C-alpha cells in the first residue's frame, strides 16, 4: 500500500497576524528611538477546511464504518518574526516572515485515523502586489505530525493508508493577503498538504 497518509486540498485559510513591538509598553528613551527595531513579532490563527484526494479504497467505504469520508479540518496557531524595516534583511525582504506553527487536524474518523497534531516551521512571502493593501502571497510548512492511528491486524485492520504513528507534514499554499489595518491582515487561498512516512513503514 502507499506510504503517504493523506493528501489534503485546503479550500480557505484565514490568518490574523498581529505585529507586536517589543518596547511598545515602555516609555521611549533616546537610545530606544535611535536603535532600529531588529524584529517584528506576529501571532497568527489559521482555519482550513479541506477535502481529501481519495486515492485508496479506505476513503471510499472500505473501513470499519463502511462509509465514505473525505472532509478535513485543520486549525493552526502560529508565531512568526519579521526583520525590522530598518535592518538590512528587512529592507531586502520587507514582506517575508518565518516562524513555527502548531496545527490540529481531523479527518472526521478519529477511531481509525486519529487526530494528528503537526509541529512545523514555515515561511510566508509576497509574490506580487495587487493593490495598496492587497497582495498575492505564498507559504510553505515543513515538520512532523503526531497522533496517528496506524494499521494493526487486530485493532485497526481496515486502515491501509497509515503506517506510522509519526509522519512528515508538508504544506504549500497560495493566498490573497488583505491588510485591513496597520497591525492586522486577513488571508484566504488554497493549499496542498501531504503527510508521509517516506516509505519507511507500510500497513
Predicted feature locations:
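Cleavable N-terminal export/targeting peptides
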Residues: 1-37
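Short loop/turn motifs that connect adjacent beta-strands in outer-membrane beta-barrel proteins
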Residues: 24-40, 84-96, 111, 128-136, ...
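Extracellular loop and loop/strand-boundary signature of outer-membrane beta-barrel proteins
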Residues: 61-65, 107-110, 156-162, 198-202
Amino acid at each position: 500500500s502507499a506510504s503517504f497518509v493523506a493528501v489534503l486540498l485546503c479550500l480557505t485559510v484565514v490568518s490574523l497576524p498581529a505585529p507586536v513591538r517589543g518596547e511598545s509598553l515602555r516609555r521611549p528613551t533616546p537610545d530606544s528611538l535611535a536603535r532600529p527595531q531588529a524584529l517584528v513579532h506576529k501571532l497568527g490563527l489559521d482555519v482550513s477546511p479541506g477535502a481529501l484526494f481519495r486515492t485508496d479504497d479506505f476513503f471510499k467505504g472500505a473501513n470499519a464504518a463502511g462509509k465514505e469520508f473525505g472532509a478535513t479540518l485543520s486549525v493552526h496557531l502560529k508565531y512568526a518574526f519579521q526583520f525590522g524595516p530598518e535592518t538590512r534583511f528587512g529592507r531586502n525582504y520587507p514582506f517575508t516572515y518565518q516562524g513555527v506553527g502548531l496545527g490540529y487536524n481531523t479527518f472526521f474518523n478519529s477511531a481509525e485515523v486519529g487526530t494528528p497534531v503537526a509541529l512545523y516551521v514555515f515561511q510566508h512571502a509576497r509574490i506580487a502586489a495587487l493593490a495598496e493593501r492587497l497582495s498575492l502571497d505564498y507559504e510553505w510548512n515543513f515538520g512532523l505530525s503526531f497522533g496517528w492511528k496506524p494499521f494493526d491486524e487486530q485493532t485497526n485492520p481496515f486502515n491501509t493508508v497509515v503506517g506510522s504513528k509519526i509522519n512528515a507534514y508538508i504544506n504549500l499554499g497560495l493566498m490573497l493577503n488583505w491588510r485591513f489595518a496597520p497591525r492586522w491582515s486577513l488571508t484566504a487561498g488554497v493549499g496542498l498538504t501531504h503527510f508521509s512516512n517516506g516509505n519507511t513503514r507500510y500497513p
